A protein has these predicted regions:
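A short SAM/SAH-binding and catalytic strip from SAM-dependent methyltransferases
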Residues: 101-114
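A short glycine-rich, Lys/Arg-flanked "PGG" loop and its adjoining helix->strand segment in the class I
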Residues: 115-130
Length: 237
C-alpha cells in the first residue's frame, strides 16, 4: 500500500479531473440514481455528481485514508447530505445490489488483478445497473515507462529495485471484454482512447511524477526522491 500526499495529488491531477468531468457527462444522470465512485481521490468529481443527484446519492470510496480525509474536509456532509466517503479497497467491495451506476476514473490501473474488482462491481449493482470506468490501458505512458524502467536498472538506482515488479495493471479491450462477458455484463463499449497530458509548468510535472509514479519514488529513500525525479524530468520536457 502506498502513502498518498493528498494535497500534492490535488495540485497535479488537473488532467485526471478534466477526463473525469468528460466521463461524468457521459453518464446521463437523471438525478435520482444511486452511484458508487471507486477511487474517488479528493472527491471533486464525486461532489459534482452529488450536485446533480438531488433525488439520489453518491458514495465515494478510496483505499487511501489520506484521500478520504481530504474529501471529507472539502465536501462536508452538512453541505452535501447525499454524499458520503468511505475508506475501502476496490478489491474488497462488500455492497450488495445497492447502486444503479458504478463509476471509476483514473483508478483501476493501480490494481494488477482486476478480477476481484469486477466481481465486486457486479455484486454492487442493482439489476440493470451499469458500469462506466476509465483507466490507464495497454500501452499507457509508454515513453515514461521506458525511461523509468531503464533508469532503475542503472548503477545509481538498481539496488533499490532488486525485487521490484511492474506495479500497474494496464490492460487492453480484448482482456476486458473477456472478463466482463464472463461476469454477465452486456458490453456497450470497451476501447482504448488516446489522451495527451499537459502540465502548466515543470513543478506540476514533478508533482505528477511523485504521485502517479510513487511505486518508483517510494522505493528509494525519501531524501533521494528529488534526485530520482530530477533524472526523469529532462527526458519528459
Amino acid at each position: 500500500m502506498y502513502t498518498w500526499d493528498a494535497e500534492q495529488y490535488k495540485q497535479s491531477s488537473s488532467n485526471q479531473k478534466k477526463w473525469g468531468t468528460e466521463l461524468v457527462s457521459k453518464l446521463g444522470l437523471k438525478g435520482n440514481e444511486h452511484v458508487l465512485d471507486i477511487g474517488c481521490g479528493d472527491g471533486i468529481l464525486t461532489a459534482e455528481m452529488a450536485k446533480i443527484l438531488t433525488g439520489g446519492l453518491v458514495v465515494g470510496t478510496d483505499s487511501s485514508e489520506e484521500m478520504i480525509n481530504l474529501a471529507k474536509k472539502n465536501f462536508h456532509e452538512k453541505d452535501y447530505p447525499n454524499l458520503s466517503f468511505i475508506v475501502k479497497d476496490a478489491r474488497k467491495l462488500d455492497f450488495d445490489g445497492e447502486f444503479d451506476i458504478v463509476f471509476s476514473n483514473a483508478c483501476l490501473h493501480w490494481i494488477i488483478d482486476h478480477a476481484p474488482v469486477l466481481q465486486g462491481i457486479k455484486r454492487s449493482l442493482k439489476g440493470g445497473g451499469k458500469m462506466l470506468a476509465q483507466m490507464g490501458g495497454k500501452g499507457n505512458a509508454a515513453e515514461i515507462v521506458r525511461i523509468t524502467e531503464q533508469l532503475i536498472k542503472s548503477e545509481r538506482w538498481a539496488r533499490y529495485f532488486n525485487d521490484f515488479t511492474f506495479p500497474y495493471g494496464f490492460y487492453g479491450p480484448e482482456e476486458y471484454k473477456a472478463w466482463l462477458t464472463d461476469l454477465g455484463f452486456k458490453i456497450v463499449r470497451a476501447e482504448l482512447i488516446p489522451k495527451d497530458m499537459v502540465f502548466e509548468n515543470r513543478q506540476k510535472l514533478a508533482y505528477w511524477i511523485e504521485t502517479t509514479w510513487m511505486p518508483y519514488t517510494q522505493a528509494v529513500p525519501e531524501h533521494s526522491h528529488e534526485e530520482l525525479i530530477g533524472e526523469m524530468l529532462p527526458e519528459l520536457l
